[in-house]
Regions:
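Residue(s) in the substrate-gating loop at a strand-loop-helix junction
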Residues: 132
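The beta1-alpha1 cofactor-binding region of Rossmann-like NAD(H)/NADP(H)-dependent oxidoreductases
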Residues: 52-62, 94-95
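Substrate-binding pocket helix/loop in short-chain dehydrogenase/reductase
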Residues: 88-89, 96-98
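A hydrophobic alpha-helix adjacent to the NAD(P)-binding/active-site core of NAD(P)-dependent oxidoreductases
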Residues: 49, 92, 100-101
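A glycine-rich helix->loop->beta "capping" turn
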Residues: 66-79, 85
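Active-site helix of classical SDR
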Residues: 112, 148
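Conserved glycine-rich cofactor-binding loop
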Residues: 11-12
Length: 168
């Protein structure tokens, strides 16, 4: 039975390439993005296009339920969705700063919460959170972006420790 992978932010760039690579390796791949029209090329080669907005809990919940219904399992989660918004901390509206965290941190965290129970039940699984060198270094005019990526690094490290007893 092929392994099943979910890749968020798969409409372009790294997410698209990760989806293509996993598909070539024989995985059943669900490529997720807000706009599935941007996933049409992936669908033509057999990758499942999945509409998912990582700022919308219902969207994420229904996406995971669809994968489980269709395949019975989820083996790999690649949390790749994210973006950078730049400017002086004092100039970025708080709504924009919150949105940066919704996309880069809270969506990633919610997907982990949704898939981890399935992975624990099947006693296997891999979660990869795509971060950035911006999670290790900070530059002026990137405070909100860097803060979100530092949060991804911290969550990933905590998740590694929390799941250590379940790894083989």
């Amino acid at each position: 039975m092929p392994k099943t992978a979910l890749v968020t932010g798969a409409s372009s760039g790294m997410g698209e390439e990760i989806a293509r690579t996993l598909h070539k390796l024989g995985y059943t791949v669900y490529a997720a993005a807000r706009r599935t029209d941007r996933l049409e090329q992936l669908a033509t080669i057999g990758i499942h296009a999945l509409t998912m907005d990582v700022t919308d809990n219902e969207s994420m919940t229904s996406g995971i339920e669809k994968i489980i219904t269709e395949t019975g399992h989820i083996d790999v989660l690649i949390n790749n969705a994210g973006y950078g918004s730049y400017g002086a901390i004092e100039d970025i509206p708080m709504d924009e700063a919150r949105h940066q965290f919704e996309v880069n941190v809270f969506g990633l965290a919610r997907l982990i919460q949704l898939v981890l129970p399935y992975m624990r039940a099947q006693r296997s699984g891999t979660i990869i959170n795509i971060s950035s060198v911006g999670g290790r270094l900070t530059n002026p005019l990137g405070g909100w972006y860097h803060a979100s990526k530092h949060a991804v690094e911290a969550l990933s490290d905590a998740l590694r420790m929390e799941t250590a007893p379940f790894r083989h």
